[in-house]
């Protein structure tokens, strides 16, 4: 949700709860979700913390169009990753033009994808991470995105298991806003 989720206040929001029972009012949490802390303040918060995973692995799923990446996302989330994040062609082009990120793009990005979905798994058991990455590769190929196909660009998955490799992609992705703001033109995406 981006911005104020005013739609959560309409009567439809009161119709059914997630468990299918009749609603008993409006859940204000839905209104607050996009407000970036501008609609309320908290005097006490209870968090459920989980330990950091011992190992993370990452798959960079390359797609020839933005829309094909978005369509594939609904399938990829069924693998239960800890994160699925988009890096689009605008971000990739800007990263190529910035000297600190150019080597990252040249090393890990194959061809000229229109979109990359960064899929992360973080299981305690390294064998389970390996199994999940294999399932990711298979799913992406089954969806029709494999470099083994004869067309000019069909996509595929680059696997990253080393912490340093993943950190380079994460740094590029997390710096996305700064990269976008570094554009020299008045028209920013």
What are these regions (language model features)?
Residues 1-189:
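Noncatalytic alpha-helical scaffold of FAD-dependent oxidoreductases
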């Amino acid at each position: 949700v981006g911005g104020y989720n005013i739609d959560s206040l309409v009567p439809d929001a009161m119709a059914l709860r997630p468990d299918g029972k009749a609603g008993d009012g409006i859940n204000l949490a839905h209104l607050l979700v996009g407000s970036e802390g501008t609609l309320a303040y908290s005097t006490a918060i209870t968090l459920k913390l989980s330990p950091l995973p011992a190992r993370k692995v990452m798959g960079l799923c390359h797609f020839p169009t933005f829309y094909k990446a978005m369509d594939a996302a609904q399938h990829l989330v069924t693998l239960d990753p800890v994160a699925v994040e988009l890096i689009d062609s605008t971000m990739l082009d800007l990263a190529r033009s910035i000297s600190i990120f150019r080597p990252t793009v040249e090393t890990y990005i194959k061809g000229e994808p229109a979109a990359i979905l960064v899929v992360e798994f973080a299981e305690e058991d390294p064998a389970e991470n390996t199994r999940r990455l294999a399932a990711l590769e298979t799913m992406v190929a089954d969806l029709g995105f494999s470099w083994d196909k004869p067309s000019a660009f069909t996509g595929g998955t680059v696997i990253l298991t080393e912490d340093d490799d993943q950190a380079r992609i994460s740094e590029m992705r997390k710096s996305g806003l700064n990269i976008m703001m570094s554009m020299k033109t008045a028209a920013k995406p």
